[in-house]
């Protein structure tokens, strides 16, 4: 049961609500879409210069499926905590075979609440696949299937788009963050009525923050010997429950990207009551389990302009062959995306890069060349993430692109610090990403200043920069699709042995770049072998079984096999090869006599 605010807090909250017209809490009724005009409808000529709210995402997907019924089908794979549909669009050219018989790529967005550019990138994948006139895209759709789920956690994405709140990464399952027995009782408020709940600061000689020497607008952590001034800081809002803390129990509390049942940890903050506890994450995992043809995945996030791969633990825990595959694909990913860094989650120094490059990282130097770097001992363990889960459990080559780099590394230390981001905002964005500090009379704290980074421009690009980010990330997904495993029958011959007996000689190849199974699956005993099977009317197999297991096929490799058969009459011998991630291939040869 949610604890009721004190009488004083209720009075203050009422005052704030009347003065701003909004009170941003999980239980509040959502207002209209903020910040952007309605987005134009789905159309071949549309451009991505608008952020979609959930209703517009739904309409986009319905329109896309209706416009291209031969390529796209729309379904809901589950419900969010608040009951919104988790929409998924299956895209493939069915004239090339059943969707489940082709190697597939999973694409999702909207997992982290304030990273709404990820939704646009996923919609961009849909748009490119359906509307492109490029023959290579048409050919890819004959040979691949795409499963695109643009809005995995729509409840909190809606908070971002339709309330002043910049929500944390969370589902909207209520959670007692501060352990007081109440749930979600102290959220944020837009006190100054500018449409966004930003940051408050107040001078205090005991504060932990002080202005940066590089730019006084930026607060950095206090160091020994600092002279001040010193500040306290909070997210904009009031103390709703009268406990002396501010915004310590905001809406939700379970981080969906720490709730996946891959490398999940009981000690990870935001992990939830148990692995896969959240309805949205469970729906995704159940879909993946039911679709073993998913060979690659892209889980869009923001920001940093970084290509992330597993693991969320040190690289030595990854099988070497899998690590080698990831490094080669990541390097190609940097080439097609133009981003500057590809790294494991563990070795990524959030938010903008790593000052001491690791051997497992690939990065772009000042001349634009892609390089590998030196070793580093420290790391960032983020347990229960999507790419670890898809990789570990299902053997999927999973990437997570952190879309959009805001600013430049002016001093070459491998990071984009706050003052460097502010310079970029001043010079390139005309100051639209950062609100200058302005005084405000807080009903509880007294005189404070309100300002800081706005919702768009820092973590999500401004609308005019959105299309380029969408383009480069769609290119990355198509690169992933081109490099999945893909089975082909490269040889099928029937050699007469005398009478009506023949030796059937066959070769099954993986003409894709990736192996049919990753080493992580082989080591865990979960690998599925490539299977080859012969048959036909009047065909009798004399040696062995008509169905053979060919094991795992590495990328660009082939395996020969043979059978001895009897053909009692003239008929057609058929050979089929299948692997869930490599697809289905078939061929036939005439055999026997009249």
Annotate each predicted stretch with a short phrase.
Residues 118-162:
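Short helix-loop-beta-strand segments that form the rim/entrance of peptidase-like active sites
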Residues 73, 146-150, 155, 161, ...:
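Metallocarboxypeptidase
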Residues 583-593:
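Edge beta-strands of extracellular beta-sandwich domains
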Residues 30-37, 78, 91, 145-268, ...:
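Surface-exposed loop and adjacent secondary-structure segments within mature catalytic domains
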Residues 9-22:
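Bacterial N-terminal signal peptides
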Residues 508-523:
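Short amphipathic, basic-aromatic surface patches that mediate peripheral association
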